[in-house]
């Protein structure tokens, strides 16, 4: 588009998924002039095909990524507070059998997950006894006990759009169906 060449932006972003619009929102909120181009519609790619989970990264505990888990749990709580209309708490059941890691080990991991989190809204982890489960349960009879923990579900496309709307309200120029085909440097500018 010819009018893109008429203005020099502080920040130019190619891609209108959650990362692109999130950066646009943050940069525009800090007073930078921002232009974002997306070759299709906003949230039309990976951002609308996610697992739809806002999770704390429970599996990263196994690799001792405590800081990453703590940061993820903190951000999960912030997002849940900011957008309860598109992010909902969700309880997960983790059945346990003897062939898995020791029960005490899993419980320890979940206790660490609780400890690292900044939970003010979500309930903590708990033990679950399936011995009294009703017939027609989706669980196999081999599952006698397990654990329950919380994470969140998000309307991922809506999260992208809300970030895009906020970025635009802060002055960002957002252009969907605008493909970036080339970028060159001239006099220290792109």
Identify what each model region corresponds to:
Residues 4-19:
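Beta1/beta-strand and adjacent pyrophosphate-binding region of the FAD-binding site
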Residues 22, 55-56, 158, 162:
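Short amphipathic alpha-helical face segments that pack within enzyme cores
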Residues 24, 28, 166-168:
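Gly/Ala-rich phosphate-binding loop of Rossmann-like dinucleotide-binding domains
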Residues 52-136:
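Dinucleotide-binding Rossmann-like beta1-alpha1 core, especially the glycine-rich loop
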Residues 113-165:
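Short linear elements at protein peripheries
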Residues 147-190:
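Helical element adjacent to the flavin cofactor pocket in flavoenzyme catalytic cores
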């Amino acid at each position: 588009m010819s009018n893109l060449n008429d203005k020099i932006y502080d920040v130019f972003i190619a891609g209108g998924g959650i990362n692109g619009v999130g950066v646009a929102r943050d940069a525009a909120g800090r007073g930078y002039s921002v232009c974002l181009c997306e070759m299709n519609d906003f949230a039309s790619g990976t951002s609308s095909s996610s697992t739809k989970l806002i999770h704390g990264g429970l599996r990263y505990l196994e690799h001792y990524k405590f800081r990453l888990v703590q940061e993820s749990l903190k951000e999960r709580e912030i997002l849940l507070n900011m957008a309860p209309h598109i992010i909902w708490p969700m309880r997960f059941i983790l059945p346990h059998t003897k062939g898995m890691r020791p029960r005490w080990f899993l419980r320890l991991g979940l206790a660490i997950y609780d400890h690292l989190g900044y939970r003010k809204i979500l309930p903590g982890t708990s033990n679950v006894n399936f011995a009294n489960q009703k017939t027609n349960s989706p669980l196999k009879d081999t599952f006698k006990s397990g654990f329950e923990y919380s994470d969140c579900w998000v309307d991922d496309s809506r999260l992208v759009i809300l970030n895009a709307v906020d970025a635009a309200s802060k002055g960002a120029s957002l252009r969907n169906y605008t493909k970036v085909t080339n970028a060159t440097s001239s006099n220290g500018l792109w």
